[in-house]
Amino acid sequence: MKKIVNRLIQCILTLFIVSVLCFALTKAAPGDPVLTYVEPNMSEEYIQNLRESLGLTKPLYEQYFLWLGRILHGNFGNSLMNNRPVLTQMLERLPATVILMGTSMLLGFLIAIVLGLYSGKNKNGILDKITSLFCYVGISIPTFWFGIMLIYLFSVHLHILPSIGMHSDGNRSFGDLVLHMVMPCAVLTFANASQYIRYLRSSTITEMSSDYVMVQKAYGMKESGILFHHVLKNAMLPMITVLGMSLQSLVSGAIITEQVFAWPGIGQLAVTAVMQYDYPLIMGITMFTALLVVLGNLLADILYAVFDPRIRKAGC
């Protein structure tokens, strides 16, 4: 319980620091959001009144605390592009991002279990070397380049997969959704699996050299039984933390991937907001994604404590 309380305090401090950095960097960015969205022939008086109505003439510290207070009440402000509530736009885009990120994380995790487990069991074998090459390539290749190559091969050259969007015009079927997901999901899955495999392989190698494995082998227990019933269970514990830590890279990868494939998620909305100097939307998306990442890490810590008795005892 004490450990959870400490983590909650850390989460609050993290979000506070993120809010300060987000506000400061946005204010320090070049360009005037007001001049971006007014007609060139508008009078200086009108522009000044607009700045006052948006609260941009107040001291920076006052602007920050007013903005923070609104966020704490669930009010992220209105977008400068369309004057719609920022929170409404994010919630509209959230399902598409969750579908893409959740599917890629699940597939990457399943691939990691198979390849990481057998790679760790057969250390320095042919499968281990092939898997290591797979991981190095997956970590090294930029997601945008991999996405563009997939579009060129499967959309431009072979014409077998759609390259943009979440659905075809007039087609909202599940099969159409799956076809649109194949390439963006493959990009994120490749990157995720490459990270997960390395950690699971390392944990498997450590567990395979443990005393309890030697004892079970001495008792004549089959190696496959030891691997799946004992080694996998213990090797999976560090993966809980890894999954929480990978949320940051998954979110950043999703932003790029959504833009490449025109996937209508929060990532694409974020890029549009940056290109249009829509500061309320930029700050809202930043805080919203930071909250999701922090909560994901907190959940990973809680699950780790639930499944590992040593952590529970240490936190008492």
Question: Which residues make up each language-model segment?
Answer:
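Alpha-helical transmembrane segments of integral membrane proteins
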Residues: 2, 90-127, 172-316
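Cytoplasmic-entry segments and transmembrane alpha-helices of multi-pass inner-membrane transporters
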Residues: 1-9, 114-150, 237-239
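An internal, D/E-rich "acidic patch" concept
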Residues: 57-113
